[in-house]
Swiss-Prot record:
It comes from Arabidopsis thaliana (Mouse-ear cress). PROSITE patterns: GAMMA_THIONIN. Confers broad-spectrum resistance to pathogens. Keywords: Antimicrobial, Disulfide bond, Fungicide, Plant defense, Secreted, Signal. The keyword Cell division does not apply. Its main location: secreted. This is Defensin-like protein 10.
Length: 73
């Protein structure tokens, strides 16, 4: 009886460790909105990212020739 209890305990601990290491860190969702202040066709994501903080966003990127600002929701 003692051996089977130890075996069950060891198996349970192994399963718990397996699941604990399989979970990764959780990231916040990213919300995007078209920029209101960026003028012209967006070809360079760096210039888009520089325009977005003035609109209250943390960054930005070009997509479909338009500047989209982003921040954590």
């Amino acid at each position: 009886m003692k051996l089977s209890l130890r075996l069950i305990s060891a198996l349970l601990m192994s399963v718990m460790l397996l699941f604990a290491t399989g979970m990764g860190p959780v990231e916040a969702r990213t919300c995007e909105s078209p920029s209101n202040k960026f003028q012209g066709v967006c070809l360079n994501s760096q210039s888009c990212a520089k325009a977005c903080p003035s609109e209250g966003f943390s960054g930005g990127r070009c997509s479909s020739l338009r500047c989209y600002c982003s921040k954590a929701c």
